[in-house]
């Protein structure tokens, strides 16, 4: 399975000119923990996450309506491409303690947002299938069994 297939096809993103309040509303409306922040051509400029809300907004008493998202977004941002494997993405996310990883094309245009949850669900599904196959093999009463 390709990395893009693990992403929500309707990625949550807003332009760098948007406000922090816009980003928070988008996360709440879409039930996601991160939004991609893109420039006028759709290229990833940063990522804004729940952690950014807690670490950069909540304790500073800044007005979310008046604060541009570009001031609080995480940048530079680690990116995955369509050629990144799920295993490589998982390794990056675990090593860097990321819960979200933007997936981009060769022009850095945002295609999807990969979440650690999506990766782990896929991995657990693969392991369950492997376990079922092994169980069937062991319990199969064939020749020599």
Question: What are the residue ranges of the model-derived segments?
Answer:
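The conserved cystathionine-beta-synthase
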Residues: 13-31, 38, 79-97, 104
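Short, flexible active-site loop motifs that bind/organize anionic cofactors or intermediates
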Residues: 10-13, 43-44, 79, 109
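Short, charge-rich amphipathic segments
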Residues: 18-29, 62-72, 107-108
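Tandem CBS (Bateman) regulatory domains
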Residues: 1-10, 49-94, 116-145
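A glycine-centered beta-loop-beta connector
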Residues: 27-30, 35-51, 93, 101-119
């Amino acid at each position: 399975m390709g990395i893009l297939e693990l992403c929500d096809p309707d990625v949550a993103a807003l332009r760098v000119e948007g406000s922090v309040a816009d980003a928070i509303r988008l996360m709440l409306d879409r039930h996601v923990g991160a939004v991609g922040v893109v420039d006028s051509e759709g290229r990833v400029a940063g990522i804004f996450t729940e952690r950014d809300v807690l670490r950069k907004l909540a304790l500073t008493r800044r007005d979310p309506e008046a604060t541009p998202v570009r001031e609080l977004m995480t940048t530079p941002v680690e990116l995955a491409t369509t050629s990144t494997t799920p295993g490589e993405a998982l390794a990056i996310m675990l090593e860097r303690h990321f819960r979200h990883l933007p997936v981009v094309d060769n022009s850095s245009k945002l295609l999807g947002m990969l979440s650690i949850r999506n990766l782990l669900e896929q991995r657990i599904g693969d392991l369950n299938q492997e376990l079922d196959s092994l169980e069937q093999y062991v319990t199969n009463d064939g020749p020599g069994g």
